[in-house]
Amino acid sequence: MTASPKNEMSTVFKRLMTYVMPMKGMLTLSILGLIVYGLVDAAFIAFIKPFIDEGFSQNPTVVAGVELPTSGGFSANKDVMLMAPLVVIGMFTLRGVANFVSTYCISYLSAQLIMDMRQQVFEHYLRLPVSYIDRENSGNLISRVTFDTEQIARASGSALISIVRDSITVIGMLALMFFYSWKLSLCILVIGPLMGVVISIVSKRFRKVSVQIQSAMGGVTATTEQMIKGHKNVLSFGGQETESKRFYEVNDRNRYQNMKLAMAQSVSQPVIMIIGSFALAFVLYAASLDSMKLELTAGTFAAILGAMLAMLQPIKNLTRVNAEFQRGIAACTTVFELLDTLPESDTGAHQVERVQGHLRFDNVSFSYPGQAKPALNNIDFDVKPGKTVALVGRSGSGKSTMASLITRFYTGLEQGDIRLDDVSIYDYSLKSLRSQVALVSQQVTLFNDSIANNIAYAYPGEVSREQILKAATLAHAMEFIEQLPEGLDTQVGENGVLLSGGQRQRIAIARAMLRDAPVLILDEATSALDTESEKAIQLGLDNLRHNRTSIVIAHRLSTIESADEILVIDQGKIIERGTHASLIEKKGAYAGLYQMQFGE
């Protein structure tokens, strides 16, 4: 049975509170500020009646133990009436301080909640299996980091304000109205032009900070998208910590910009209210003037009318909070479902510094989740340390699937096993297994950083400039790097957009060269390149394959003629195997593919 909406909301709310409770000091301050705000609103309306009725009474009265003899109208005790503006200013100042405390604290809670949830979601992405990232829409993944988390914080803040402050205000005003009896009459409150000046200044500040927030948000989105696009490389090269730190920096910058906006909001609102209090104070002061005596109205009427007007906005807020709260709950549900997604299975405990590189597929069959047709069927081959096996075949035949299984990007074999140095790859820890493998694919992922840092990305520890230079030289990348104005320090742009395809490929080869892993996977590393680039890259790949166990997936058969063994894959099965010469002589499927490419 599915949980009822009420139970689901309760569960989500309790889980959301686990993010807020570490900041319970700020939460307490915000609630106290909201309570004081609501009480001051009610108290101010309550003071209107005694100020008017007692101050303007025809007969002597006693207020707070002080006798107020009056001769009628405006000639009543002027000391009391002169004190009224000071009381009003004091109350509104207290109200402004309470509003500042509550608004700033809630903004702090919201900004910290956004930052914490975004960081948690981002780091969870780094632990998710490739299968999850492949089947999800990248836009939805980014939206959960950027939009959903912000919706949660916004809804939480709005709900807290309405439930505490507006509820107390409404209850207080209703109590006053029922206490004084029901009356309704005119109401006009004119706010001076000074408020317009303040609003104009603050609006300009809001616009400026909003632009900065949009820029910071762009950094968050770009970093997230970059990680998602390069998810395999991040996992393969163990770059989770690097990506987490990179995201923390842009995430924290976004939080800082939001706090600048919060400060402007927190200051502007009490300033406007204090200015308004001076306007009201002037009205009360003017009431003590002789010319205003005959225009005075009853205190009860003024108090009830004031209570009615003061109650309108809180009621509107309370009617809106449910819709806002529901949007927040929906966003919470989406984010929590993501966080509840199981990370990559990492039950293996086998650790090794460096394997020999003996790789074996032992009658492996595999199907993708939800697919009835197997992607691989009874795949059986053996690669000795330092040898090269090439996989050829039409697109969709299962070649890249085999590469994904070696790195455990996909798991769940239907039968058989994959062994590395006679140990099942599922017995290795993920970190240990992937540290033995270097991956170079057709779709090169470069990060928005320098060439040197992109090459060093694959290295597990500190790397020297000399090591980077050596790797770039062996990859034949220095040929173009030396022509760049800043050499290795040249920024490559987002995903290497400032470099050509061949240049990006050579940086990827240098990255794998620096990693110095005993097992190498080349997945279409030279496809879709011009002849000149292919020659330079092929030289780099030849250096890279030296003394490494290599799995080469290729469409261009000229690049794998020297392989120790060539496997022809068709519909998930090995239909031919042998050396280039033997397969040509056999005149089978491989010879047919070769004939198609070279017409020989």
Curated annotation (Swiss-Prot):
Chemical reaction(s) catalysed: ATP + H2O + lipid A-core oligosaccharideSide 1 = ADP + phosphate + lipid A-core oligosaccharideSide 2
GO molecular function: ABC-type oligopeptide transporter activity; ATP binding; ATP hydrolysis activity; ATPase-coupled lipid transmembrane transporter activity
Chief location category: membrane
EC numbers: 7.5.2.6
Pfam families assigned: ABC_membrane, ABC_tran
ABC transporter domain span: 359-596
Alphabetized Gene3D superfamilies for the sequence: ABC transporter type 1, transmembrane domain (1.20.1560.10), P-loop containing nucleotide triphosphate hydrolases (3.40.50.300)
Domain ABC transmembrane type-1: 29-327
Segments crossing the lipid bilayer: 28-48, 80-100, 159-179, 182-202, 267-287, 295-315
Subcellular location: Cell inner membrane
CDD domains: ABC_6TM_MsbA_like
Domain comment quoted from the record: In MsbA the ATP-binding domain (NBD) and the transmembrane domain (TMD) are fused.
Xref: NCBIfam families: MsbA_lipidA (TIGR02203)
PANTHER family given in the database record: ATP-BINDING CASSETTE SUB-FAMILY B MEMBER 10, MITOCHONDRIAL (PTHR43394:SF1), ATP-DEPENDENT PERMEASE MDL1, MITOCHONDRIAL (PTHR43394)
Protein role: Involved in lipopolysaccharide (LPS) biosynthesis. Translocates lipid A-core from the inner to the outer leaflet of the inner membrane. Transmembrane domains (TMD) form a pore in the inner membrane and the ATP-binding domain (NBD) is responsible for energy generation.
Family: Belongs to the ABC transporter superfamily. Lipid exporter (TC 3.A.1.106) family.
Subunit structure: Homodimer.
UniProt-recorded name of the protein: ATP-dependent lipid A-core flippase
Organism of origin: Shewanella denitrificans (strain OS217 / ATCC BAA-1090 / DSM 15013)
